[in-house]
Amino acid sequence: MSAYGHGRHEHGQNFLTNHKIINSIIDLVKQTSGPIIEIGPGSGALTHPMAHLGRAITAVEVDAKLAAKITQETSSAAVEVVHDDFLNFRLPATPCVIVGNIPFHLTTAILRKLLHAPAWTDAVLLMQWEVARRRAGVGASTMMTAQWSPWFTFHLGSRVPRSAFRPQPNVDGGILVIRRVGDPKIPIEQRKAFQAMVHTVFTARGRGIGEILRRQGCFHHVQKHNHGCAREESTPRPYLPDCTPTTGSISSR
């Protein structure tokens, strides 16, 4: 069964209709390069303007009728519409850019798929506003963001009013831009160890990073990655290998 459910409304997609917001997303896409993979093109609000960028586009749409409609309406040979559930879609092993107005209730599942996938370089995603804020570390850093911070950067874009969608959701949307780090401070081979350490910091008891990690017997790993600059602080920091303090609280969500 598709993760998007059965009826179109059950797919969770709210169509973007505000041209100002559409143009702002296209402007962000213009700052990237390479082929584009679009998640859930829906009515083609982003697909059609992106077709004028002169780049190959693969639009992955779970709704068969909408996929056929976009195919008929798109004259550009650069646009390929694929009828599939994005969560089942195999991403290319070559550099590409991810773009999408994603179903709010599938945001976490889609982000997990993307963060585990190789090759793509940038992602411009429209999601629920509060989720975009948390993923960007605004107000409170999440464990997911902290666990992937050595390999990706998360930037919060503009807030999108709920009136910009049809049907109108109960909450505002927000733009999140994710970029893959070209020269990460921690090798990807050490991802599991690093993420386990971050999980410990977010879930274990203690007054600060130093105390928590010493109690767990892994403080020397932080010292190694920080080249001796790791130190105990009263507030845990989401990006452990970096000695630059950050502000805000943390959340395990």
Swiss-Prot record:
Any matching Pfam family: RrnaAD
Chain residues that bind S-adenosyl-L-methionine: 14, 16, 40, 61, 85, 101
Enzyme kind, highest EC tier: transferase
Residues that span the membrane, as ranges: none
InterPro entries named in the record: KsgA/Erm (IPR001737), rRNA_Ade_diMease-like_C (IPR023165), rRNA_Ade_Mease_Trfase_CS (IPR020596), rRNA_Ade_methylase_Trfase_N (IPR020598), SAM-dependent_MTases_sf (IPR029063)
GO CC terms, sorted: cytosol
Record keywords, A-Z: Antibiotic resistance, Methyltransferase, Plasmid, RNA-binding, S-adenosyl-L-methionine, Transferase
Keyword RNA-binding included in the entry's annotation: yes
Ranges of compositional bias, category Polar residues: 244-253
Disulphide-bonded residues: none
Gene3D superfamilies: Ribosomal RNA adenine dimethylase-like, domain 2 (1.10.8.100), Vaccinia Virus protein VP39 (3.40.50.150)
Region (Disordered): 229-253
Protein family according to the UniProt entry: Belongs to the class I-like SAM-binding methyltransferase superfamily. rRNA adenine N(6)-methyltransferase family.
Function: Involved in erythromycin resistance.
Name this protein carries in UniProt: rRNA adenine N-6-methyltransferase
Native source species: Corynebacterium diphtheriae
